[in-house]
Amino acid sequence: LEFTKPVQRLRECVDIVRGILKDSDVNYHGEIYDIDRFDLWFEPLRKEIPIYVAAVFPKMLEICGEISQGAILTWCTLDHAESAAWHVDIGARNAGRAPGDVEVASLLPCAVSDNREAAKDLMRQPIASYAGRFPRYRQLRVHAVF
């Protein structure tokens, strides 16, 4: 699949997952995805499972506030986390939801060592790898002075 229309793609993915969990037999015909007779082969433990969506940039964070139960941040500073939470709140309000109904969580990669330099060395490869694989996130890293 060509990765286009990320906002529409996210909306449809969340719709599809909710439909599968609720009914287990899904027909979905959207702008991005076209699914006929998807049948989940097992019964979910619950029909409603909170959906958290990973996002970094303002528009997608606002979409998280509109359609999910939580936004997952990654590799971010406290300043970015504060700004991200503000965008999630905007999205929640736009959808008529209370901002407090949408959680903001973060993946916090770290290295533990008795030696500070050794811990830094352990993080160099993951930081470089992430920056190399996800070019759009370089903008976030530069702004955060990583």
Which stretches of residues belong to each language-model region?
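Residues that line or immediately flank small-molecule/substrate-binding pockets and catalytic motifs
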Residues: 21, 55, 75
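Generic beta-strand structural signal
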Residues: 24, 47-51
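Glycine-enriched alpha-helix->loop->beta-strand junction motifs that scaffold or abut catalytic
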Residues: 63-72
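Short, glycine/polar-rich helix-capping loops at beta-to-alpha or helix-loop-helix junctions
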Residues: 59-61
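Solvent-exposed alpha-helices and their adjacent loops that cap or buttress functional pockets
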Residues: 42-46, 65
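An alpha-helical appendage that flanks or caps ligand/catalytic pockets
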Residues: 3-40, 81-146
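Short, acidic/turn-prone active-site loops that include or flank metal/cofactor-
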Residues: 76-80
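Hydrophobic faces of well-ordered beta-strands that scaffold small-molecule active sites
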Residues: 51-54, 71-73, 102-109
